[in-house]
Curated annotation (Swiss-Prot):
Gene3D superfamilies: GHMP Kinase, N-terminal domain, K Homology domain, type 1, Nucleic acid-binding proteins. This is Polyribonucleotide nucleotidyltransferase. The keyword DNA repair does not apply. It is an enzyme of class 2 (transferase).
Length: 704
């Protein structure tokens, strides 16, 4: 009799066979083991039965981790252990978190930790979809009040057809990499990058992925039913009705007036004043035992009042917080070339959101090497997003990038990546950094706009300029409003926010987060149409400042050149033990890369360095010409003649009979090592041996 009570579900999902099982591994947690094709992921969920005293937020943590043993590899880091999370692990943790978080009831604050561990991988598929399915299943069999399950799907677009859960190899030829997650009836999350697809094609991919994942949702529901865990009885605490009425009656009008203040900092100050006044008026004596509880209730009621005030104003057709219409983009100010010694720079300002973006061009040695389950990845493009506390007028401790910064940086990267030139055409390593210097919503899309401008300012030949816009949606019953270029407050108080980046011809990145059910395909279609109009408006403004990439690379960037040599000459350029190429690098300061086919790529600090490196390489690889006179240096004297260096690394023999017209008894009477002489190439035999002569050659003659 087995000691394990294993329950499992097995089903076909696209081209992959999926098995979800529980009861065999990690039995002290709510755990499932997901096998999906060649990938296995263990997902464990721990749910605290009680909330911490005074807890006022939902402490949900998702950790996705890839173990190198899963692919039969030993980590390359110090100590040969997995270190801090990679960017892909961090992004996947966020990918799982986003569709799950909205499915817990309002007011639920028990701590939940989800750990997804990749324990086996065929290196042919990403494990994020399997991990998302596992997280949904583990939560569904737990006692947490989770309003799931959810499903997850990756969608590609290859040869005009949608492809479900494409492999890593298939994604290389796909015009789309889209991940969609949702419940039985609603899409909750979309994350994607695309090669200028239309709004209809993107929406079609979302709906296709949601339709295909229904089999996942059904099987997880059956698994949860078979396990039969009793869910926690949770009822969200109701707001004190009497206190709510007082706060609304006494301070509702003041809150509405505060939201008519367009300046963010002034508005926040006024709202804080009103909150303090409400606490003073309604919380009672600060020394009383009931004060702390009443203060917390008033703060919660006040936040609800702000939420309802903004939403009601939008749905009733009133101007937005800053006075704009629903589809109006904030005022734009665009500058390029603002930092004289960077390779490319742009200052993009949209209302109270501002990004200072720089581009740096590097050589092949600057490539970012990433150790992954699929092998070592050479990343030639990096986009880093920084969000300092001062950008929102706050103080705080600066440190390593947080998950949000990594996620926003990846979204901005997705927006511009498809428009980068091929590495064969433009071999530079590119690093873009977006410093958010002011923020009031949509900073990731400001980074997309700034990145496009900074890249073009640096002379990177983009296929087309890219702009991004953040959209929001407020919905109550049948009434809804789509908002273009949302503020921070509109982001927090809305039911859906989505970000769209693209060119004039199509979408390059789409991110969508939906907090409620009832967002139909018609609503999403309208939102995408409105986003398209906003994107074109921003692109037109950008094009007025810099319509295309500069025709030349910035003067401060490394100078680049390519030359071709005969593959037989590669060893001459490299030299014994690499001595020649090391000397070349030391002499010129250039970085020199040589391919097996004889292609040499040279990155010099400036044009002069590149030119000198080319000159020296051409001298090393030059072929001697029969009948041509060369100025050479005597390398070695022997009894039968002298070996003379006529080109770098190329020696020929002056036979004793070819030194002078008269008979020569001793070579050393005429020649010595280091002596410079003029010689004529008589012949080169089929073994490459060079015959030289001094006869009839004027020794004052210079090299031809």
């Amino acid at each position: 009799m087995s000691m394990f009570n294993t329950i499992s579900r097995e089903f076909q999902y696209g081209n992959e066979q999926v098995v979800i099982e529980t009861g065999r591994i990690a039995r002290q947690a709510n755990s499932v083991l997901v096998h999906m094709g060649g990938v296995s992921v263990l997902v464990a969920v721990v749910v605290k039965s009680d909330a911490k005293e005074g807890q006022n937020f939902f402490p949900l943590t998702v950790n996705y981790q890839e173990k190198m043993y899963a692919a039969g590899k030993i980590p390359g880091a110090y100590g040969k252990r997995e270190g801090r999370p990679t960017e892909f692990e961090t992004l996947t943790s966020r990918l799982i978190d986003r569709p799950i978080r909205p499915l817990f009831p309002e007011g639920y604050v028990n701590e939940i930790q989800i750990t997804a561990t990749v324990i086996s991988s065929d290196k042919k598929h990403y494990a994020d979809i399997a991990a998302m399915i596992g997280a949904s299943a583990a939560l569904s069999i737990s006692d947490a009040p989770f309003n799931g399950p959810i499903g997850g799907a990756r969608v590609g677009f290859i040869n005009g057809e949608y492809v479900l859960n494409p492999s890593i190899e298939e994604l290389k030829s796909s015009d789309l990499d889209l991940v969609v997650a949702g419940t039985k009836s609603a899409v909750l999350m979309v994350e994607s990058e695309a090669a200028e697809l239309s709004e209809d094609q993107m929406l079609g991919a979302v709906l296709y992925g949601h339709e295909q994942q229904q089999i996942v949702i059904d099987n997880i529901a059956e698994l949860a039913k078979a396990v039969g865990t009793q869910k926690q009885d949770f009822v969200a605490p109701e707001l004190n009705a009497e206190l709510k009425e007082k706060v609304t009656t006494q301070f509702g009008e003041q809150v509405a007036e505060a939201y008519a203040i367009s300046d963010k900092q002034a508005r926040y100050e006024k709202l804080d004043e009103i909150k303090a006044a409400a606490i003073d008026a309604l919380a009672g004596d600060p020394e009383s035992e009931e004060f702390a509880e009443k203060e917390a209730q008033i703060k919660e009621i006040y936040n609800d009042l702000k939420y309802r005030t903004v939403r009601d104003a939008i749905l009733s057709g009133k101007p937005r917080i800053d006075g704009r219409d629903l589809d109006t983009v904030r005022a734009l100010d665009i500058q390029v070339g603002v930092l004289p010694y960077t390779h490319g720079s742009a200052l993009f300002t949209r209302g109270e959101t501002q990004a200072l973006v720089t581009t740096t061009l590097g050589n092949s040695r600057d490539v970012n090497l990433i150790d992954s389950l699929a092998g070592t990845i050479q990343d030639h493009f990096m986009l880093h997003y920084n969000f300092p506390h001062y950008s929102v007028g706050e103080t705080g401790r600066e440190g390593v990038p947080k998950r949000r910064e990594i996620g926003h940086g990846r979204l901005a990267r997705r927006g511009v990546q498809a428009m980068l030139p091929d590495s064969d055409r433009f071999p530079y390593v590119i690093r873009v950094v977006s410093e958010i210097t002011e923020s009031n919503g949509s900073s990731s899309m400001a980074s997309v706009c700034g990145a496009s401008l900074a890249l073009m300012d640096a002379g990177v030949p983009l296929k087309a300029p890219v702009a991004g816009i953040a959209m929001g949606l407020v919905k109550e019953g049948d009434r809804f409003a789509v908002l273009s270029d949302i503020l921070g407050d509109e982001d927090h108080l809305g039911d859906m926010d989505f970000k769209v980046a693209g060119t004039k011809d199509g979408i390059t990145a789409l991110q969508m987060d939906i907090k409620i059910e009832g967002i139909t395909s018609d609503i999403m279609e309208k939102a995408l149409e409105q986003a398209h109009a906003g994107r074109i408006h921003i692109l037109n403004a950008m094009n007025e400042v810099l319509p295309a990439s500069r025709t030349e690379i910035n003067a401060h960037a490394p100078n680049y050149a390519v030359i071709e040599i005969n593959s037989d000459k590669i060893r001459d350029v490299i030299g014994k033990g690499g001595a020649t190429i090391r000397q070349l690098t030391e002499d010129t300061g250039a970085v020199i890369d040589i391919d097996d086919n004889g292609t040499i790529r040279i990155f010099g600090e400036n044009k002069a360095a590149t030119k000198e490196a080319i000159r020296q390489i051409e001298a090393i690889t030059a072929e001697v010409e029969v009948g041509k006179v060369y100025k050479g240096t005597v390398a070695r004297v022997v009894d039968f003649g002298a070996f003379v260096t006529v080109l770098p690394g190329t020696d020929g023999l002056v036979h004793i009979s070819q030194i002078a017209d008269e008979r020569v008894e001793s070579v050393s009477d005429y020649l010595s090592e280091g002596q410079q002489i003029n010689v004529l190439v008589q012949d080169v035999d089929n073994r490459g041996r060079i015959k030289l002569t001094m006869k009839g050659v004027e020794q004052e003659q210079t090299q031809a």
